[in-house]
Every structure is written in structure tokens, then in C-alpha cells.
Amino acid sequence: MHRSRTAPRFVVLSLKLCLLGASAQAGADDHDRGFYVRFEAGLADAGTLESLLTAVDHPTRCDVLLYPDPGLAPSSDAACRDNTSRPVFDNSFDLGSKFAGGVSIGYDLGKLRLELEHLSRHQGGQTVPARTASGNVVIAGKGNEWSPVDPPTERVSDFSSREFLVNAYWDFENDSSWTPFLGIGAGWARTNLRYQVRLLRKTLAQGYQDVAPPLTLADRPAAAAGSLSLFDHEFRGDVFGYQILAGLDHALGDRTSFTIKVRWARFAELTGRGIATVIRSHAPVQADGTTPFGSDLEFDGIGNVGVSAGLRYHF
């Protein structure tokens, strides 16, 4: 899930290019300079979002709240006393392509342009089968506990991102009315999403206690049959990122131009912690009956590939 932090290098490179470009443009004609505003709209494809849920998890038989007398729970078992936090679910989601719109204010130095940009986008959501993280023997051992009618799922929904970036563009001026340009930018995104994982156990009629060696009935307390475990939490935060841009400007007059632009943007991981909504149809607590059942989430792959069109007006 962790990726190298290349964004700071982009910031340094951006500043160097800006200073170099500004020096080169010191003698530019006055008519090439000035403030401008741009409005744009288009589509942004969010690509694949990766999630990782990490938590402390115990075998079902360890849950003291499943017994009429908590002393009947095998709390002395090594597995019941293991409070190591491990990856539980590791999944990916396709958030699809949705509308994106933005506004920018910039200053034109001739070939070099400096710009402040705000882009807003709302992506879709996706529900996928829950995927057990590799190496987690506890959650893997519960595979035969889940309902065959309503199997475990994970869902990401309500994804939104408000991005604030500083961009630098270089215009490749020529004799035509079309001006190609390249750009780089860096900034942050105020990101929001909802994540859910839902686990429903078999009922007794569906065979919850139909076990085969080495399992015994003690591994499947009857009170757990048909129970629901649900984690449903909203995550939000500011994540740093960078983008690469390219496009064409077409002059419509002395002050107005039409812009077509493509972008590739990537942002850092969004992380957070939440408490489960319900665990085995009782309070969201660990197997000891008191410790809150918390989970840590990481979301990687935040970014987009987008195309937009808009108008730029020079003051």
C-alpha cells in the first residue's frame, strides 16, 4: 500500500522551472502578460482505489458475550489472548468516470503561465466481495461461517475530492491559432469517502454448527448463528499530490481562448481509524466484551485521469 513520496521532488522541480521561466520572460512584450481566469468542465476517471483494513481479530469462540456465563468462554486460549493488529481485508474498487469542474486564476508571463486551480469531482462507488488479506489465518478460518445467501461484501461510496493546486505551464507558441502547452502542478486534495464491510453468519438452519474435524461445536457458539458484523464509517482528510497536464489553447479573440486539457493526478494515501457499528449483533467490542472494536483503514491510488474543455479570459 505504501508508495514512494515523489511529490516533494515535483514541488522543487516546479519552483526551479518557474524561476527559470520567469527570468527568460523578463523581456517579454507587455501584451503577452496579465491576469486571466479560466472555467472548465469534463470527465475524471478515478481508476482503481485500493483499501486495507487492519484490526485485532479473534476466533468466534473467544467472544465472551456469546455465552450466558462469560466464564464459559475459552479466554485463556492463546488465540483469544493474541491482541496483535493484522491486515484483515485487502481490496480494490473501480470508482468509474464522473463529472469534474474547476476554476483557475493565473498570470500570463508570455510563454510561462502560473496558476492557482480549484477542481471538484464526485466519483461513483462500488460493492465487491470481501477479500481476506493474505496470511490472516483467523479471518480465513471463519470462511465457512458466512451466509451463502448474503456473503461478505466491502463497499466504497460517496467519494468526493476538492483539489487545490499550483500549476506552471509552458506555451509552445507558433504561427497558428492553436497553442500547445505542457504543465505540472502540486497541491492538496480535501478527500471524503464512506467505507463499509458487512459480514453475516449462517443461521442454524443454514448449517452454522455443521462442523467437521478438527473443528468442534465449541468453535461455533449457537449465539453467533445469524449474527451480523458491520463496519460503516466515513473517512476524510487532506492529502498531498501532484499532476501533469497537457492541452491546446485556441484563440477566439484578443482576450478569450478555448482550452482542451488532459491531466494525470496522483495523491498520497488517505488514512483513518473507525469503530465498528456492530459486532456479532452485539455492541462493537472485542472478544473480551469491553475493548472497542476499532479498525485502521488505508486508501491508496487516489487520483484521476481527466479530460476537460473550457474558456480562458484575459483581463
Task: Give the label of every model feature segment.
Residues 39-43, 107, 116-120, 182-188, ...:
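Transmembrane beta-barrel strands of outer-membrane/channel proteins
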Residues 22-38, 48-57:
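Outer-membrane beta-barrel biogenesis signature
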Residues 36, 100-104, 165-167, 243-245, ...:
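Membrane-embedded beta-strand positions in outer-membrane beta-barrel channels/transporters
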Residues 107-109, 170-172, 248-250, 264, ...:
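Residue-level signature of outer-membrane beta-barrel architecture
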Residues 32, 109-112, 173-177, 251-253:
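Outer-membrane beta-barrel channels and translocator barrels
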Residues 36-38, 301-315:
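Outer-membrane beta-barrel "beta-signal"
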Residues 47-96, 119-163, 189-239, 268-306:
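Extracellular/periplasm-exposed beta-strand and loop segments of Gram-negative cell-envelope proteins
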Residues 1-32:
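Cleavable N-terminal export/targeting peptides
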